[in-house]
Amino acid sequence: MLYRNILRHILCASALIASLVASARVKPGIEVLRDRGFEGLQGKRVGLLTNPSGVDSQLRSTIDILAENVNLVALYAPEHGVRGDIWAGGKVESGKDAATGLPVHSLYGSTRQATPEMLKGIDILVYDIQDVGTRSYTFISCLGLTMRTCASLGIPVMVLDRPNPLGGLKVEGPLVREGYFFYVSQYAIPYVYGLTVGELAMLINDEGLNRGQKGNEDPVRCRLTVVPMEGWERSMTYEQTGLPWVMPSPNIPYPRSAICYPSAGLVGEFNNYLNIGIGYTIPFDAFAAEWIDADELKAKLDSYKVPGVAWRAVHYTPFYGSSAKKLIHGVQYYYTDYETAPITLVQFYVMQAVYELYKKDPFELSENRISMFNKVCGTDFVSTEFRKRFRVADISSYWSGDVAAFRALSRKYYIY
């Protein structure tokens, strides 16, 4: 009986993998690299910056694929670690990877930038992480800082491209302003930038946008190669790619979570204001608090007639985080027309409604949280102007003011 059960599990796993392969319409960069015989890596000592999202369509880790086919000599860990076992903001330690025995150099510990010593002994640095398409997610900052060190040492960088889960058409939010460059706002790009990570790497490399963590260093340009996907189109949802979703970080468990992140993440910078689904099963997918009347908030938001957005009253009890173990009430939101929906303004409509109904002002919280909110926004204009009346109309023109120019610039780097 034991052997029969084991065999059944093996057959089920094989069927799942076969199904994934059959349904995949898009080949990620790691598969294209493999099809090309690992061109550019043969005979070289290879370093790999990755996390659990670096897999092929059969869920095989890029670590394993490279270790079997080229001379993989070192791993580099972004936020959450190479194996994804570190919580958001948690310090990642350097050490050895238990599975492979390879040295792991932390890029989210005592330093955020690879040191020359860390890169000693490699001939090329490969990057393979699933991006989420939003400027404040730290993986793209980690990539840029690593590109800077590689440039100074003459080490080439190879980016294995992956789909942008927000698609390649959605661009929203202002560019980062001087004085607000930070690890969560490292480049002068919109909050949602509509590029794959490979396209973004080319843009920051060629346009002189890679100016260090605080945006005040001379731009540098590394020797960059992007291994493109095959079959991806800018209009695709992630589900249409046919690729399995492996969460790039603990609070992005589903493709929808990546879409919701820029819709609620700014509100998440205000501790003890609204729960945004973190600590429950819908991260970045809701706005709730003990003192909210869910039906009242839904009615107020419905009255705004936000294009492409529908609202549903919800009640839930977070397991941890803000309002942990307390019954809270609020709204969950849905995109009925993603193309027209202003996804990054959703959170501001919620703040407007909450202020109109309950006079709750998140900017009365600690200066530290306001500072972080401004850094993620890339400017203090939003907090200053929005707080005056809590009206989305007061910031919407500013919020979209850089989009057209950035679209024109970024088209130069479209691979797809």
Question: Where are the regions a protein language model picked out?
Answer:
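Glycine-rich oxoanion-binding loops at beta->alpha junctions
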Residues: 92-122, 134
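Glycine-rich, aromatic-lined ligand/substrate-binding cores of catalytic
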Residues: 232-314
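Conserved anion/nucleotide-ligand pocket segment
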Residues: 180-261
